[in-house]
Amino acid sequence: GQLSVIERGGRKALRVRHAEAASLTGLGPLAYWPADPAWRLRARFIPHPPGRTIAIMDITSQQAAKPNPGMVEFEHSGQTYRLEALEGDAGGLFLIFADRTSGHDSYGAGRYLDTQAPAADGTVTVDFNRAYNPPCVFTDFATCPLPPPENRLDLAVTAGEKRYARPAG
């Protein structure tokens, strides 16, 4: 196994990971919508003033202020939508969103999506085919951030990972 120290809400805890845990070895198949180029969108990154944060609630009802570098604006089916972005890896963006499939065909609390860093001209590719479920789908011990109210899309994103069905037993 592996131990690591995590901090949540100003409190420290130990996280234990074990490669042969039943939650990993008993993992059922993942389901995805068929890849669709119509969900690979060219978006516009709209930066916020430096230092801006956004309140993000996690699945345990803990709230934290997270760096919010800007929002992405995209069009789909003739409508314009915006998602507030968090800082991602390597200068990229981390998007937490819910949509009209949430709780039906996809995980009820929302999904995640990582992007590369916005280009110099302010464009960024938002490929919903790469949307994935948060870790709390697979374990009761994860403290997953939830979509802020601004990131609840009035749109059915029929792309990316679908709702996970835990194996019986």
Feature locations, PLM:
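Generic recognition of long tandem-repeat/solenoid scaffolds
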Residues: 5, 12-16, 71-76, 95-97, ...
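Short, ordered beta-strand-loop transition motifs
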Residues: 6-11, 64-68, 87-91, 117-122
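Secondary-structure transition/turn motif
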Residues: 15-22, 97-101, 129-131
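Short helix/loop capping segments that flank catalytic or ligand/cofactor-binding pockets
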Residues: 23-25, 50-51, 83-84, 104-106, ...
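Mid-length scaffold segments of soluble, non-membrane domains
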Residues: 65-102, 106
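Extended, aromatic/histidine-rich regions of cofactor-dependent oxidoreductases associated
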Residues: 100-104, 112-117, 123-125, 129-169
